[in-house]
Amino acid sequence: SPSRGLGDVYKRQAIDVVSGEFKWVFAISQITYGGGALVAPDGTIYQCVRNATINNVYAINPNGTQKWAVKLDAAIGAFPALSADGVLYCLTNKSTLYALDASSGAIKWQQSLDGATGSAVAIDKAGNVYAGTSAAIYSFKSNKEQNWKLEEVNVTEQATFALKDQVLYATLKNGGLVAVDMTNGTKKWTYPTTKGDAYFPIADKNGNVYFTEKGSQTVHAVNASGSKIWEKNVGNNLNYSGGALSTDGILYIGTQSNNKVLGLDITNGNIVFEETVGQQVMAAVSIGPDRRLYCGTIGSNNIGSIKAFAVNKTLATDSWSCLLYTF
């Protein structure tokens, strides 16, 4: 979480999910924002940060100590991606795609892409890498060989892709969703919207895709053919809002205005869950294996908190809130 104090300090915290108590804090100076943390199977945390003058990719051990850090060619707003064979892919704001050795941070290869901004990166089960910028979407093999390139696509910054049944779904700057054939890079369809940047697509087991739209306070549901299932105006700003999909068919999202986390029935978009969290939510929410929702919030002076609360209010373990102070 970014905070203001003696200079700008970004603190990656580890918090006990049962009690809400801090386990450790890892501070990174002089940065503001960056894509969310990626946690590897061995517990290593990888964090990219949006600053070009300091180390901007960090690997943090499970105990909160630094494993390695490296400086790439520009600030990084995009979320990183980790392959099964231990390669960390990072896409900088200069639209340079890097493949790093996840164990050491050594650069294996790098590739300059078209576009003023690097937006999103993902990996499929075969190890192919997908990168989206403000100008195009690319697919590469793990050895840097390019599979294909789809031009004239402006992917929303600080974004993610959804991959489902050999189709890549990307949300677009200035609104909309595009579906791309992952085998050859052809555009299958575009679902246009008109009210501002679209964020964080998420696909369910049936291939339906859900995404949020900044300007219209709307959550969209689209089927695998690109046809509308429903759209829901939730009456709250959705700035950098991403959803979490539960196994029982509820899409949870956080809102910037009205300081709420909402749950929408994915069959019809009806709001079936609502929790006031007291501060703005400007990021994706998460569902833990304990059936609790976790969200980060931000308030005045960029002082935020991590909140956890049970979806099922009959659970004995209900909720906690952990304040992230400036220091």
Which role fits each region the language model picked out?
Residues 21-26, 66-71, 106-111, 146-151, ...:
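A short beta-strand motif characteristic of beta-propeller blades
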Residues 31-37, 75-81, 116-122, 155-162, ...:
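Repeated scaffold domains used in trafficking and secretory/extracellular systems
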Residues 1-10, 325-327:
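Single conserved hydrophobic/aromatic residue that forms the stacking wall/gate
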Residues 39-42, 82-85, 123-126, 163-165, ...:
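Residue-level detector of Asp-centered blade-edge/turn motifs that repeat once per structural unit
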Residues 4, 45-46, 88-90, 98, ...:
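Conserved beta-propeller blade signature
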Residues 16-19, 61-64, 101-104, 141-144, ...:
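Short loop/turn segments that connect beta-strands within beta-propeller blades
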Residues 282-324:
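Blade-level signature of beta-propeller repeat domains, shared across WD40, Kelch, NHL, RCC1
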Residues 8, 50-52, 93, 134, ...:
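Short loop/turn segments immediately following the C-termini of beta-strands
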